[in-house]
């Protein structure tokens, strides 16, 4: 049976994550307050950030940037795509 959480991003009850997706306190907070649907939204947004900013994930500064953007995405004012980003046409 899946667990439900009140998703901080979607502001409604939804299926919770199966395990903490990130280490430490941030991972615990994500596990307790973020739904699977919202996590998938973050994964898509994170891919945009990695591609548009050409981030290398072995670089500690890139990982720190993504962590800050993740906190903003879920718990802050929101993370916005780079200005140069144009979504693919449907």
From Swiss-Prot:
Belongs to the Fe(2+)-trafficking protein family. HAMAP family: Fe_traffic_YggX. The keyword ATP-binding does not apply. One of its GO terms (cellular component) is cytosol. The keyword Ion transport does not apply. Could be a mediator in iron transactions between iron acquisition and iron-requiring processes, such as synthesis and/or repair of Fe-S clusters in biosynthetic enzymes. One of its GO terms (molecular function) is iron ion binding. Keywords: Iron. Gene3D superfamilies: Fe(II) trafficking protein YggX. NCBIfam families: PRK05408.1. This is Probable Fe(2+)-trafficking protein. SUPFAM superfamilies: YggX-like. It comes from the Bacteria. GO terms for biological process: cellular response to oxidative stress.
């Amino acid at each position: 049976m899946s667990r439900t959480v009140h998703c901080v991003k979607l502001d409604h009850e939804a299926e919770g994550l199966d395990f903490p997706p990130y280490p430490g306190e941030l991972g615990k907070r994500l596990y307790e307050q973020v739904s699977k649907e919202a996590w998938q939204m973050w994964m898509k947004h994170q891919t945009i950030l990695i591609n548009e900013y050409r981030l290398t994930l072995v670089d500690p500064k890139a990982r720190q940037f993504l962590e800050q953007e993740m906190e903003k995405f879920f718990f802050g004012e929101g993370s916005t795509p780079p200005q140069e980003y144009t979504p693919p046409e449907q």
